[in-house]
């Protein structure tokens, strides 16, 4: 797993994007989310769907505004049902949470590379990356992390014989690639 999984993912994404090289990757084990959420002081969300995890004592109700504690954040990100296309709901929760997380972490670091380094040191054991720390910090501060900088590959989820399958809308993907790589510059 770990590094090999990341390298395979990079190759698959590059292939999907017509051979465009992927400059780097950062992946984190979910157990690191407890630490990140704590460093961020929690993340406030409007709960997108009911999420329960009795083992963690989590019972979130759709529509409530909630500052997620560490266990709630973990459950909110991991929760999934067996319903068709449930992965899409999970992705929506992940995007929502990540936007709030990076807002909070950026506010805590406030351009202070030493504070960012301390945060990184606390989660380093959970991270797999081929990117140098200073570049990660620089890119996150420069790039920002909001809904305008997140793209969803267009396509359709269909039920196969045993599992859901996602079929990419190649024309729509091409449009996004053109928008991101050419219109942004």
Description of each model-found segment:
Residues 68, 120-185:
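C-terminal solvent-exposed extensions
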Residues 24-27, 75-76, 150-152:
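Structural recognition of the beta-strand scaffold that forms the well-ordered cores
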Residues 32-115, 119:
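Flexible, polar/acidic helix-loop-strand segments at domain edges
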Residues 1-9, 15, 35, 89, ...:
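Short N-terminal signal/transit or membrane-insertion segments
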Residues 1-3, 19-24, 80-89, 105-110, ...:
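Second-shell loop/turn segments in exported
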Residues 14-19, 38-45, 82, 99-110, ...:
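Sec-exported extracytoplasmic/periplasmic mature domains
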Residues 4-39, 94-102:
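CE4/NodB-like, metal-dependent polysaccharide N-deacetylase domain
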Residues 3-7, 23-25, 54-56, 129-133:
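A short linear-motif detector with a strong N-terminal bias
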């Amino acid at each position: 797993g770990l590094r090999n999984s990341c390298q395979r993912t990079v190759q698959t994404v590059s292939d999907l994007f017509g051979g465009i090289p992927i400059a780097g990757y950062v992946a984190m084990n979910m157990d690191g989310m407890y630490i990140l959420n704590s460093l961020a002081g929690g993340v406030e969300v409007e709960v997108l769907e009911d999420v329960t995890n009795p083992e963690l004592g989590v019972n979130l109700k759709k529509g409530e505004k909630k500052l997620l504690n560490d266990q709630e954040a973990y459950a909110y990100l991991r929760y999934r049902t067996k319903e068709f296309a449930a992965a899409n709901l999970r992705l929506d929760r992940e995007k929502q949470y990540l936007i709030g997380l990076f807002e909070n972490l950026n506010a805590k670091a406030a351009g202070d590379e030493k504070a960012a380094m301390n945060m990184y040191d606390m989660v380093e054991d959970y991270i797999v990356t081929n990117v140098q720390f200073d570049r990660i910090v620089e890119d996150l501060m420069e790039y920002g992390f909001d809904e305008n900088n997140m793209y969803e590959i267009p396509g359709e989820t269909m039920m196969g014989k045993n599992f859901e399958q996602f079929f990419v809308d190649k024309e729509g993907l091409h449009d996004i690639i053109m928008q991101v790589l050419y219109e942004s510059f």
